[in-house]
């Protein structure tokens, strides 16, 4: 029995390290190496899924092609519901990329045994467990809705800051700063909290007991991806329509 416990302890599934990072030096800048590694993993999964789904396209889809077409239809409907029939098509790739990246990134934190991969410092985790990732995604969303607004309305897009009255100019400007903040911190907080809670429970009690909470975490992670993509589409639609 003691030998079994010793063997099990070789795999630090519940070891928690908060605030430590594995840094890479790139051009004189320090970047979080573990975030780049897990992000590349997520991107590789998405690229591989795309290749498998389009390698031998059939008129009557089946298997993995059928699953990917269902995912594409779901993303298309999401964009259509938020942006409308006339405007949604150019934005399907952007909204879909956001949703799929966040979805796979969130689930990788629960399904991939990152803890057994040792690093000199810090530990591997879901990319969305790092505030830098969520802020980057939120800033991309901000750039997207500014681009959509200026492309659709030209310089007239700036009139939105004076609506419905010029007195609200400071509040309207502040709103553009709070949107990416709320997007990034909501996603970061939910994913970090989920991984910390599951990690503590696995550390304190047997593996079987935290399983229901892990399942709930997978569901919540999927919902967070949906919320982020839906809000991104809604912000883009708002920028093009010119009203709140």
From Swiss-Prot:
Among PROSITE patterns, the record links this protein to:
ATPASE_A
Q: Which NCBIfam families match?
A: ATP_synt_6_or_A
Membrane-spanning segments: 33-53, 92-112, 130-150, 196-216, 217-237
Q: Where in the cell? A: Cellular thylakoid membrane
Give the matching InterPro entries.
Answer: ATP_syn_F0_a_bact/chloroplast (IPR045082), ATP_synth_F0_asu (IPR000568), ATP_synth_F0_asu_AS (IPR023011), F0_ATP_A_sf (IPR035908)
Tell me yes or no: is Thylakoid among this UniProt entry's keywords: yes
The protein's assembly and partners: F-type ATPases have 2 components, CF(1) - the catalytic core - and CF(0) - the membrane proton channel. CF(1) has five subunits: alpha(3), beta(3), gamma(1), delta(1), epsilon(1). CF(0) has four main subunits: a, b, b' and c.
Function summary: Key component of the proton channel; it plays a direct role in the translocation of protons across the membrane.
Q: What is this protein called?
A: ATP synthase subunit a 1
Q: Name one Pfam family in it.
A: ATP-synt_A
Keywords from the UniProt entry: ATP synthesis, CF(0), Hydrogen ion transport, Ion transport, Membrane, Thylakoid, Transmembrane, Transmembrane helix, Transport
Q: Which CDD domains does the annotation name? A: ATP-synt_Fo_a_6 (cd00310)
Q: Its topology with respect to the membrane?
A: Multi-pass membrane protein
**Lineage: superkingdom:** Bacteria
Record the organism.
Picosynechococcus sp. (strain ATCC 27264 / PCC 7002 / PR-6) (Agmenellum quadruplicatum)
Q: Which GO terms describe its molecular function?
A: proton-transporting ATP synthase activity, rotational mechanism
For this record, the Gene Ontology CC terms, alphabetical, are:
plasma membrane-derived thylakoid membrane; proton-transporting ATP synthase complex
Give the family this protein belongs to, as stated in its UniProt record: Belongs to the ATPase A chain family.
